[in-house]
């Protein structure tokens, strides 16, 4: 596999480094990134007094995590689209106040099974509210990929690192 074959406008971002960089991962940049999405700055994230952009920026910048807030936000947008999934509603019967923005553990053969498995994961990990769901998802991404040397989407998809296990 020659990565030079992917140096095209629609594929280049798979080589972006996913670790935090204070010089361009600013809170204002994350705010601008989220404009026009269901996570824009017009309202607080569910069950918190914080805006989504502040959550992504502050969680990504934490020293032990060091994850690009752009990557976290883009991953949520990829998983949640318009933001209408029961996995992030906080109102699903039996799972009130639990959220799973990254769809971690959300698998199954029916929509109902996918939702329940994802919300079971959120409940088991105490992801109550948007903040704790994003914090938990960021930790999964950091521990499972980035801290194991897979800090680009390319390296996550094509594991070429002998120290990584994914």
Role assignments for model-derived ranges:
Residues 57, 77-80, 92, 97, ...:
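Generic hydrophobic/packing signal
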Residues 27, 31, 53-57, 69-73, ...:
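Extracytoplasmic/secreted envelope proteins and their assembly/folding machinery
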Residues 7, 18, 34, 72, ...:
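Generic detector of leucine side chains in alpha-helical contexts
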Residues 85-92:
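Short, solvent-exposed loop/turn and secondary-structure capping segments
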Residues 23, 27, 45-53, 65, ...:
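Solvent-exposed, acidic/flexible segments
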Residues 1-65, 146-166:
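Cell-wall glycan-active module
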Residues 1-7, 94-166:
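Non-catalytic cell-wall polysaccharide-engagement segments
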């Amino acid at each position: 596999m020659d990565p030079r074959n992917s140096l095209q406008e629609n594929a280049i971002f798979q080589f972006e480094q996913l670790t935090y960089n204070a010089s361009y991962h600013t809170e204002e940049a994350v705010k601008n990134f989220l404009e026009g999405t269901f996570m824009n700055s017009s309202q607080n994230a569910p069950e918190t007094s914080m805006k989504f952009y502040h959550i992504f920026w502050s969680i990504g910048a934490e020293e032990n995590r060091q994850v690009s807030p752009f990557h976290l936000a883009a991953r949520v947008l990829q998983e949640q689209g318009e933001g209408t999934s029961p996995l992030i509603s906080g109102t699903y019967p039996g799972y009130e106040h639990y959220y799973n923005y990254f769809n971690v553990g959300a698998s199954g053969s029916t929509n109902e099974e996918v939702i329940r498995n994802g919300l079971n994961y959120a409940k088991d990990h105490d992801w109550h509210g948007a903040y704790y769901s994003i914090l938990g998802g960021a930790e999964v991404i950091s521990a499972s990929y980035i801290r194991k040397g897979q800090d680009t989407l390319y390296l996550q998809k094509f594991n070429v690192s002998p120290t990584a296990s994914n």
